[in-house]
Amino acid sequence: GDGQYKASLLPKLISPINKNKSEVVFGSRMLKPRDALKGNMPIYKFIGNIVITFIQNLFLRSKLSEFHSGYRVYSVKSLKQIPFQYNSNFFHFDTEIIIQFVIAKLKIFEIPIPTYYGLEWHANHIIYAIQVCLATLKAKIQKLGLIYDKKFDCDSKNTYFYISNENKNLESL
């Protein structure tokens, strides 16, 4: 990894799943926003994170403190409830999977984590922001019944199974 997230916090992230309090747990740098700045988060990323998260919460009617932290834990059960195999292979996969969890009405537990910035992320921030906003807008438009994308077909009653590319047998996660 890039050293942004403390491995020692992993047991704290896994705990709510092990205690059946949640199926999805996010480490959030924005539960204590001043700590994000103290951890050297660049101001443009800090402001961008707040603005984009606000837009996403507004469109999705969610209340997450952050959509853009990569420190997350998903239970197998949660992954069986969403069609994540249709998600992007690029950086905005992180937003698509959150949107799916929100649509599926899964409980998302957030835990404050410290911010550490060292090596710079090498993705184009503008393109990432556009992709994230477009995915969120698409999910909102689908909820209004104006379009359909199987990626956002996350009815909470669905269970998804995946075909292994290695042996072509139907298997559950």
Regions from the PLM with identified roles:
Residues 7-91, 118-127, 133:
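Acceptor/aglycone-binding surface of glycosyltransferases and processive sugar-polymer synthases
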Residues 1-4:
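The conserved acidic donor/metal-binding loop of glycosyltransferases
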Residues 12-18, 59-62, 85-173:
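Hydrophobic helical membrane-anchoring modules
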